[in-house]
């Protein structure tokens, strides 16, 4: 699947779950389960509850996402 197939959205981290997984509420109100992308994990980017993040969703499963950017 190419990068163009992903849906990019922004949201807010509302809960931290085990294994670097987070519950994120998107700007449209939907809640998804998101994990950290590999580059963020490699560079030790810390994500806390309340952070604004950019996530990528796949069109096949809109309940799971990947966190690709943490806003300041």
Curated annotation (Swiss-Prot):
PROSITE patterns in UniProt? S1_IF1_TYPE
Report one GO cellular component.
cytosol
Top-level taxon of the source organism: Bacteria
Q: Name one GO molecular function term.
A: ribosome binding
Output the InterPro entries linked to this UniProt entry. Answer: NA-bd_OB-fold, RNA-binding_domain_S1_IF1, S1_domain, TIF_IF1
Magnesium listed as a keyword: no
Q: What is the annotated localization of this protein?
A: Cytoplasm
Statement: the UniProt record of this protein carries the keyword Transferase: no
Keywords from the named record: Cytoplasm, Initiation factor, Protein biosynthesis, RNA-binding, rRNA-binding
S1-like domain sequence ranges: 1-72
| Annotated family | Belongs to the IF-1 family.
Function of the protein: One of the essential components for the initiation of protein synthesis. Stabilizes the binding of IF-2 and IF-3 on the 30S subunit to which N-formylmethionyl-tRNA(fMet) subsequently binds. Helps modulate mRNA selection, yielding the 30S pre-initiation complex (PIC). Upon addition of the 50S ribosomal subunit IF-1, IF-2 and IF-3 are released leaving the mature 70S translation initiation complex.
Q: Which NCBIfam families match?
A: infA
The record describes its quaternary structure and partners as:
Component of the 30S ribosomal translation pre-initiation complex which assembles on the 30S ribosome in the order IF-2 and IF-3, IF-1 and N-formylmethionyl-tRNA(fMet); mRNA recruitment can occur at any time during PIC assembly.
Protein name in UniProt: Translation initiation factor IF-1
* Species for this entry: Methylococcus capsulatus (strain ATCC 33009 / NCIMB 11132 / Bath)
């Amino acid at each position: 699947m190419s990068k163009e197939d992903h849906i990019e959205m922004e949201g807010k981290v509302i809960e931290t779950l085990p294994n670097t997984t987070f519950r994120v509420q998107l700007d449209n109100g939907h809640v998804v389960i998101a994990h950290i992308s590999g580059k963020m994990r490699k560079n030790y980017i810390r994500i806390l509850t309340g952070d604004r993040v950019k996530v990528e969703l796949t069109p096949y499963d809109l309940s799971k996402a990947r966190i690709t950017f943490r806003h300041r």
